[in-house]
Curated annotation (Swiss-Prot):
Family: Belongs to the MscS (TC 1.A.23) family.
Membrane recorded as keyword: yes
Superkingdom of this protein's organism: Bacteria
Topological domains annotated Periplasmic: 1-27, 86-87
Main subcellular location: membrane
Keyword Cell inner membrane on entry: yes
Protein name: Small-conductance mechanosensitive channel
Subunit and partners: Homoheptamer.
């Protein structure tokens, strides 16, 4: 008897509140649809961004981390929207999320600035893995660009780790960006040397050197009158990968040609005058 009464009461409630009931069920269904669509959108967006970053040769660690941020941002927005559809007040939830974000941001201010700088570095592509650079006064080859720092390998094999925010706020010198590098050396000769003859000899050496870029200007000029020498500035453009070896070979060839023409490279001389006094 009681069971029939309860069923009858439920039936009467549904009959009296069927519009509200249908609206509530509709909101639940809409909420579920939003969750499904939002989840699918997060996956698709993550995949698109990841493929884009792979094509741009962006570091895999950066791309995965950035994709995770996009994914969870979409999911949080989806969940909040879904809860709002079923009548839950989302204002307080948004306030809590905002407060938590501010607290985390203040606690991780340095790390977040490093991360933001890292994103800028890989996006703007100031340098790539393997480039020879000067970052914050440190010279070496780029080993990796990570989320919070960049690793550089120096000539003597040291691994230097530099925070990304320091890199982005200082001068970046990339020696690998251009195809050619400027070779610059100083050649010193005796004061008795014929200036015109010295310049002709050096220019002839540079013109015969196949690794010197002929399309660019060659410079040989008297730069300084030293304490015991005439100092000539010698400039020429070479391919960046051959800079060291070419510079060494050019110096050797110039020395040989100067010797052939009996033009000496001086060394510093010190005159010592000794004064003697007669003993009384």
């Amino acid at each position: 008897m009681n069971i029939y009464k309860e069923i009858d009461n439920a039936s009467n409630w549904i009959s009296d509140n069927h519009i509200l009931f249908i609206k509530y069920i509709s909101n639940i269904i809409l909420s579920l649809i939003i969750l499904i669509v939002g989840y699918s959108a997060s996956k698709v967006t993550q995949k698109i961004i990841k493929n884009f970053m792979i094509k741009k040769n962006i570091d895999i660690i950066i791309s995965e981390f950035f994709c995770s941020i996009i994914k969870y941002s979409i999911l949080i927005f989806t969940i909040v929207t879904s809860l709002g559809c079923i009548g839950i007040q989302t204002t307080s939830i948004i306030a809590v999320i905002g407060a938590a974000g501010i607290a985390i941001g203040l606690a991780l201010q340095g790390s977040l600035s490093n991360f933001a700088a890292g994103v800028l570095l890989v996006t703007l592509r100031y340098f790539r893995t393997g480039d020879y650079v000067n970052l914050c006064g440190v010279k070496g080859k780029i080993k990796t660009v990570q989320i919070f720092c960049t690793k550089i390998k120096t000539k003597d094999g040291k691994i230097i780790i530099i925070p990304n925010n320091k890199i982005i706020s200082s001068n970046i010198i990339n020696y690998s960006e251009e195809l050619h590098r400027l070779m610059e050396v100083i050649i010193s000769t005796e004061y008795t040397s014929d200036i015109k003859n010295v310049k002709e000899i050096i220019i002839d050496v540079l013109k015969k050197e196949t690794r010197i870029v002929k399309e660019k200007k060659i410079t040989v000029r008297l730069k300084n009158l030293g304490e015991s020498s005439l100092d000539f500035l010698v400039r020429g453009w070479v391919y960046k990968k051959e800079l060291k070896q070419t510079t060494s070979d050019i110096l050797e060839k110039i020395k040989i040609e100067l010797d052939k023409n009996k033009i000496n490279i001086p060394y510093k001389q010190i005159d010592v005058n000794l004064k003697y006094s007669k003993e009384k």
